[in-house]
Amino acid sequence: MAVNHYENFPVASLLLPARLRPAVRALYAFARGADDIADEGNAGNEERIAGLDYYAAQLDKIERGETPEPEQFRILQQVITQYRLPTTPLYQLLSAFKQDVVQKRYEHYDQLFDYCNRSANPVGQLILHLYDAATPENLRDSNAICSALQLINFWQDVALDWEKQRIYVPLDDMRQFGVTEQHINHQQYDAAWQALMAFELQRTRELMLSGSQLALRLPGRIGLELRSVIQGGLRILEKIELVQGNVFQHRPVLSKWDWVVIGWRIVRM
């Protein structure tokens, strides 16, 4: 289960109504393309920022009612017009991707949470708008779920992010538990690291559960899709706990048995 950036889009899910799949694919293409500019290949920071600025310029054209240049953006324009989607979430995604280019550490949890607000929450907001279900209550709970999914991805990918010289664990949390960057560099799995991970996992679980009622309010396929996402995220948290936070040697993935467990829990929600 991957829950980073654009992969929060349920692009291939059979639970999506056929009528919405083209729209979701267009949104996915935008997010995937922008994320790749920020994170893939060997381009320098200036080139990455320029690429993201180009995406923003195409959004600006859509905002002004002009026709953007590449076909990808013309398709996106049609989706935005058809479903009366706000463009603010798309700009927020670009802002987060730019931040990924230049920022590798987060001093406080609030800073990380703000990043999640722009890197993950726009996904849920756009999906709710597609379903014409973007009420204040639904948006609040969706934001909690999407931020939790993003945080889960950070905790399971500590070692992978270190390869890109990124640490998403808040530095003041690390200091509180006596953990340093050398713990990650040397994959040092000790009592301090275990305590830090236990703290982050519990906080993330509480955040996820705070938004879980959304899955029960939304009807039909979207509710079932969301219950699957929530239970999948919670299962990943459990698997990290089972190895006492040792994500260095045991990066958690969902097995067939895990999906059986998830299916049972979906029924019981």
Regions found by a protein language model. Give the residues of each.
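Catalytic cores of Mg2+-dependent Asp-rich isoprenoid enzymes
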Residues: 1-150, 155, 159-269
